[in-house]
């Protein structure tokens, strides 16, 4: 799934009247992979969600650090492994104002806190691509989707895996 910046509206004021070109819409920020995160971003560019896994205790960890928070190993040998991308919504928020110029044309949007199916409390945050007026509930099933934000750069996001049924705990954003 792809998404890009919203088209800039026509400028108002003297510049529009004189025919001057409007300033280009700022682009979204893109990841700047470092040595530790490069495998994650390379997989994301192929639309594959990966999570770091400790070589000592096999626990998935987001984000990987110098020490495994589960077993305490100071030499966790984290390796990024593909995961299903399936999970459930644990929480969400509606972003209505962006302080980053590259997102100004895209508000409002939903950010979801997702618990991945691979492990209890394995949580990641991403944009929900179903739109800001989507009806959500805690426990709603989601699946990974990807936003192609630049050539060769994709960012993991989520989409509802099935329509939310009306019922207890359902909230309209």
Task: Tell me what each language-model feature is.
Residues 1-51, 159-161:
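A broadly conserved sequence feature marking short terminus-proximal activation segments
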Residues 48-51, 58, 65:
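Residues immediately within or flanking Cys/His clusters that coordinate Zn2+
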Residues 53-56, 69-73:
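Short, cysteine/histidine-rich loop/knuckle motifs that typically chelate Zn2+
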Residues 62, 75-79:
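Short functional micro-motifs and their immediate structural scaffolds
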Residues 78-88, 138-140:
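Short coil-to-beta-strand transition motifs
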Residues 86-88, 92, 131, 147:
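Residue-level recognition of beta-strand microenvironments
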Residues 90-129:
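Glycine-rich active-site loops that engage anionic ligands at enzyme catalytic sites
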Residues 117-173:
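Well-ordered alpha/beta subsegment
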């Amino acid at each position: 799934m792809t998404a890009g910046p919203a088209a800039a509206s026509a400028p108002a004021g003297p510049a529009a009247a004189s025919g001057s070109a409007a300033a280009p819409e700022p682009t979204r920020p893109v990841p700047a992979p470092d040595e530790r995160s490069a495998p994650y971003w390379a997989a994301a560019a192929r639309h594959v969600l990966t999570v770091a896994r400790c070589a000592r205790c096999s626990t998935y960890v987001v984000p990987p650090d110098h020490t495994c928070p589960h077993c305490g190993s100071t030499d966790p040998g984290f390796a990024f492994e593909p995961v299903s991308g399936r999970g459930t919504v644990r929480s969400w928020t509606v972003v209505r104002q962006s302080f980053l110029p590259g997102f100004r044309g895209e508000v409002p949007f939903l950010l979801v806190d997702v618990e991945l199916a691979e492990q209890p409390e394995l949580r990641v945050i991403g944009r929900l691509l179903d739109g800001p007026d989507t009806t959500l509930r805690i426990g709603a099933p989601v699946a990974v989707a990807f936003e192609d934000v630049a050539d060769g750069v994709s960012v993991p996001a989520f989409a509802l895996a099935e329509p939310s049924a009306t019922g207890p705990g359902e909230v309209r954003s």
